[in-house]
Amino acid sequence: MKNILLMCSAGMSTSIMVKKMTEAAAEINAEVAIKAIPEQQLNDHLAGTDIILLGPQVRFLLDKVQSAAKDIPVRVIDTMDYGTMNGEKILRQALAILGES
């Protein structure tokens, strides 16, 4: 089971993305747990996280999150994929980074 953490300013738009990614995971039988958090809760959710995906609106936090995350991969979600809520593509990219594709 891979744990994917999505982060945005308030956790609202990423909660929709969690739903889309969870649906995509079910379709491809990927064993993942996906959750969305606001940026203020990052440190509370690092333990057990395999990858952190940042919403495009918080891309300016990339260096800060990478520093806090240490060895956890951190990526910014593509603006177009985020805007169109392409959960399948984002999930597949995360799994590829984790070597699960």
Question: Each predicted region: which residue ranges?
Answer:
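Conserved active-site segments centered on acidic
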Residues: 2-39
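Ser/Thr/Gly-rich flexible loops in soluble cytosolic domains mediating phosphotransfer, phosphorylation
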Residues: 3, 75-101
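Short glycine-rich anion-binding loops that position phosphate/pyrophosphate groups of nucleotides
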Residues: 10, 57-59
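Short, surface-exposed alpha-helical segments at coil->helix boundaries
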Residues: 15-18, 59-63
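Structural signal for conserved beta-strand scaffold positions within catalytic alpha/beta enzyme cores
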Residues: 36, 54, 76-78
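Short acidic active-site motifs
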Residues: 40-42, 61
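Short acidic/histidine-rich motifs immediately flanking catalytic phosphotransfer sites
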Residues: 46-51
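A short, gly/pro- and small-residue-rich
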Residues: 61-81
